[in-house]
Amino acid sequence: MPDDVGPAEAEVSGAVSESDNEYDETEATTKDDDEKMAERSAASEGVETNGDQKKKYDPKDPLRPRRKKARRACYACQRAHLTCGDERPCQRCIKRGLAEACQDGVRKKAKYLHDAPPEALRPVLGPNYNPAAAVSVRNGHRHPSNAGSDAGSSVGTFFSQSTQYPVFSSAATQLGSIPENLPFPQQSPVSPTFQASGNPQLGSIGVNSVSSPMNSFPPALFDPSNPAIFNFNLEGLNFGSQYGAMEFGMLGHMSSGAAETPPRDPSISQQGTAGDVGFNPSGVFGNGLNQFDKVYDNNTGLMSDFLTLDAHSSGLYSQGNLQHGLPHAYAIPAGPTSLQSPSTENNSPQPTGFGFESPTTTNYTGVPGAGGNQPGSQQSRTQKPKTPALGKLGPQSVLGKRQRDPSSIYEAVKEPFQYVASFHKLISLLQNRFSGASTISIVRSLASIRPSFMSCMKTLNRADLIFMEKSFQRALFEHEEFMHQSPSPAIACRRTGEIAGVNKEFTALTGWTKDVLLGKTLNLNANMGGTNSDTLSVSSKGGRGGIVGTTPRLKPLNPEQGPNADGQQQQSQQQKEQPQPVFLAELMDEASVTQFYEDYAQLAFTHSRGTVVRKCRLLKYRTQENMDAAAAAASSVPTTAGGSGSSNGTVVNGGPDSSPAGKTERERSTGANVASNSILSNRVAKIDGEHGISKLERDGKLECSYTWTIKRDVFDIPMIIMINFLPCYYRSHNQLAV
């Protein structure tokens, strides 16, 4: 009798176990968990649980044995909302008789992964995940045998021994005439550049025809932190840190779809078409140090072909006005062997024979009229004569690498800048050069912002002041690059008005050299903004224009100073002994400086993003020898009705010497040597020539329009003043247009 009861009990237990697979909302999951923990602990100790009483554990007991959470539940435990284990098959599936069908379940996809293809998530789901396997559930009954057979067959199909990764989706027919040993040297399989539905030739490529074995491919194929997943060549980008290069590369990767897809010539063979979508696994994780050597080779490189372009040649894929065939917009520079998706060799219209061919185009059978793909044309391109500019070019000059490291700023600055001493020098300069009314107006403007300076500076210590100077030098480092690339004359000043940066255009306009402005050489300027007689009167009357009744001069306590105790002579003697940076007040006339400091008082602390647009008069750099020579030349020239000599010795345009017949031999020789003595390069010799921007002056002054703004530091204190100038042209002044 007991033998007859055994199968019945087994059937009953099997039915009960089948019903346990179903999820019951009213059943408490904690009870089932406690039972499973008791069964597992008893099985580990070798205790028979068939006839023994199961030990109950209090769910609130802190000393009860806890189950280790699994990284991913199996399909059955996931549907039953039960805790699973890491082993496969798990203990619960073994007990229920579902050992063969036990596999990892499918998690719900996050919102940001809804657009990701399932293939991109497969390597992360573990080795037991089978997307094709599904346990059929109909009317509360399961079919474990069918599920197990389906799972066993499908798992073997996806994770076979020959690991082949498909390059394109298998939604097309097979393509014939593709050789087995087809090289794949260029593109990465994860590159989103090519779409299977957009190109009929590429869309017809099957999975098995293009797939190449990659047994050494690392498991972390879709690691977002790996820059190779988006083909970013961080070493080819001009960035000091990896984070900035990654962000810049991602922006270029997102904007790569703005360029047009290059047209395909129908005569190109299918072998060359498939070569564009190849993949070289050794190139993704290489350092890429030798990639740009091939680009900038003087004989066979890309720049050799680029510098020898014929402007009248028409390429195969010329687009209207874009005859040179370069791409519309590409933010990332790419070489012939680089791995970036927005590459100028693969994604842009390519004129043949101009050196912009992709390396994979050497596999093409031939394009009518394009001889750059044949080995003979490669040999002919190597025999092209060198251009003079090739010797100056290289990977560093073309990529625009920085010549100095900004980290040296933080190592060089050890002391804070003495702004108090600079303000005292500024007040002394204003008292010596300008009249009492202008000096008082400027001092009142500075006094209006003095409380704001004091409130911002009272909590700063020495470390803060050193950090303030480092911030200024770092900001000046960036602005100097902008000024060198700007076509307009520009200068950068401290908040005291001292010149800290200048470009070549300002030097060509005013004659003030960079060494004089930055205080590296002595300032020998004698042009104070007036005529010769006015300058002499200012010098003879103590530099105040003869105005009496203002702030008196205090005599020094040391009687040994002798005749230099007058103030201005003593200061001029000290300035000759020690060079110092030029103040902005020395570059403008009196009215312009007064107006500048009135605007400075309004813009220093009130409008953080405000700008000022005014007109001013810049002073040309004239030494005393130049002033005397110009005065002697002006006195020797007779005045006529057609023109008159200027007060500072410069002949006004329109006089007798302005005509070609009136030019002396010395002036002709000077004009012939302009290109060699030009402040700017030879390409803009006419701008810096006889009638260029260096000649736009009247009485030693330049009429200019200028705009400036203030950049503050982290303490909300004015840090750097950026000023841009543009010379004004007036026909009534008989000036010659540039």
Curated annotation (Swiss-Prot):
> Which superkingdom?
Eukaryota
Region annotation Disordered: where it falls in the sequence: 1-65, 255-278, 328-404, 530-579, 636-673
Question: Which cysteines are disulphide-bonded?
Answer: none
Q: Where is the composition biased (Basic and acidic residues)?
A: 28-39, 51-64
The yes or no answer to whether the keyword Zinc is present is: yes
Primary location class? nucleus
InterPro entries xrefs: ERT1_acuK_gluconeogen_tf, PAS_13, Zn2-C6_fun-type_DNA-bd_sf, Zn2Cys6_DnaBD
Q: Which residues form the PAS domain?
A: 475-546
Arranged from A to Z, the UniProt key words for this protein are: Activator, DNA-binding, Gluconeogenesis, Metal-binding, Nucleus, Transcription, Transcription regulation, Zinc
Q: Which GO terms of the cellular component aspect does the record hold?
A: nucleus
Per the record's keyword annotation, is Metal-binding included, yes or no? yes
The record places the DNA-binding region at: 74-102
Compositional bias (Low complexity) spans?
A: 568-579, 636-655
Stretches with biased composition (Polar residues): 337-351, 530-540
Q: Which SMART domains match?
A: GAL4 (SM00066)
A GO term, aspect molecular function: RNA polymerase II transcription regulatory region sequence-specific DNA binding
Q: Where is this protein localized, as stated in its record? A: Nucleus
Question: What is one Gene Ontology biological process annotated in the Swiss-Prot or TrEMBL record?
Answer: gluconeogenesis
What does this protein's UniProt record list under function? Transcription factor which regulates nonfermentable carbon utilization. Activator of gluconeogenetic genes.
Q: In which family does this protein belong, per the annotation?
A: Belongs to the ERT1/acuK family.
The protein's name is: Transcription activator of gluconeogenesis SMAC_06113
Origin organism is Sordaria macrospora (strain ATCC MYA-333 / DSM 997 / K(L3346) / K-hell)
Q: What is the lineage of its organism?
A: Eukaryota, Fungi, Dikarya, Ascomycota, Pezizomycotina
